[in-house]
Amino acid sequence: MARSRVPAAASPAKLGPLLSRRFFARSVHEVAPELIGATLLVAGVGGLIVEVEAYHHTDPAAHSYGGETPRNRVMFGPPGFAYVYRSYGIHWCVNFVCEAEGSASAVLIRALAPTHGLGVMRKHRGLDDERSLCSGPGKLTQALGITIAHNGAPLDIEPFAIHRRTVEPDIGTGPRIGISKAIELPWRYGLRRSRLVSKPFK
């Protein structure tokens, strides 16, 4: 099958079927690349997922590596729920819990190509530059209005809606960003040639 490149920024198009929680009940390394090109909406605002990172419970960089705590409890729950935490005490990050309950594995959503509700995103972010609206995990949560109130929310019930991708993207892999452990693991997945990813893929 010929690959079609998902654009770095796109206009609203026909959405694919909604993903159910069962989609996430698989290896985090299967789920993560399949999220590239999917559309994430929160209360109708969002865009195409262009960059993610996988975190497994055996991974020293994962929040769950040291065991269950009040902060990471959602990671230890069933798949298909949002795990939201504050990074460096500054901004929120949103993850999708994967694998069987107790596995404590998740996919961090790093970047989106805005497609829906750009006016709302611009208001939330206080800027007009479309490229800067969702080009980072903290930026996209601010743009979509994601906060700790969304922690533990099911991903297949409003305000969340995740639509399966409708084209096969050209996916790149590489080391994850901003971590100090397991830095050699190529567990970052993203849309190759996108200008919105944290670091270009080779």
Swiss-Prot record:
One Gene Ontology molecular-function label: DNA binding
Gene Ontology BP, a term: base-excision repair
Record EC number: 3.2.2.-
Keywords for the protein's UniProt record, in alphabetical order: DNA damage, DNA repair, Hydrolase
Pfam families: Pur_DNA_glyco
EC class (word): hydrolase
Superkingdom classification of source: Bacteria
InterPro entries found in the cross-reference section: Formyl_transferase-like_C_sf (IPR011034), MPG (IPR003180), MPG_sf (IPR036995)
Record-stated family: Belongs to the DNA glycosylase MPG family.
NCBIfam families cross-referenced by the UniProt entry: 3mg, PRK00802.1-3
Name the record gives this protein: Putative 3-methyladenine DNA glycosylase
Organism: Rhodopseudomonas palustris (strain BisB5)
